[in-house]
Amino acid sequence: MTERTLVLIKPDGVQRRLIGEIISRIEAKGLTVAALELKNVDDALARAHYAEHEGKPFFASLLEFITSGPVVAAILEGPRAIAAFRQLAGGTDPVEKATPGTIRGDLGLETQFNLVHGSDSPDSAAREIELWFPGR
């Protein structure tokens, strides 16, 4: 069964010119890029995307980071796309928990600047795709 997921290459990945490397790894994993856009994230989109973290101590810095520069937003498709991308991305903390061979394990520098976001469930994927690609 084909599944869809939202992936973001965060401002640190764009600034470090890792877009091509990350997309190459996604395609090598057998996932299809169904849509891709370079976006400047405004406060409203950032707040909607990270709504589950509102009220947490790191919320303000998360908003500041995601709006600090362009983001590449992509819809990926493929068998078990959500799990496949999350495995490819690696653990959230690139220094301590991300396995070598993953995007974060090989390229990440620290927890907040961990290069990519991937939806964590089918419900999250549907909600996030609608936020970033309305009507798709």
UniProtKB/Swiss-Prot annotation:
Its main location: cytoplasm. PROSITE patterns: NDPK, NDPK_LIKE. It holds the Pfam family NDK. Its cofactor is Mg(2+). InterPro entries: NDK-like_dom (IPR034907), NDK-like_dom_sf (IPR036850), Nucleoside_diP_kinase (IPR001564), Nucleoside_diP_kinase_AS (IPR023005). One of its GO terms (molecular function) is ATP binding. One of its GO terms (cellular component) is cytoplasm. Keywords: ATP-binding, Cytoplasm, Kinase, Magnesium, Metal-binding, Nucleotide metabolism, Nucleotide-binding, Phosphoprotein, Transferase. SUPFAM superfamilies: Nucleoside diphosphate kinase, NDK. The keyword Aminoacyl-tRNA synthetase does not apply. Homotetramer. Belongs to the NDK family. Major role in the synthesis of nucleoside triphosphates other than ATP. The ATP gamma phosphate is transferred to the NDP beta phosphate via a ping-pong mechanism, using a phosphorylated active-site intermediate. This is Nucleoside diphosphate kinase. The gene is ndk.
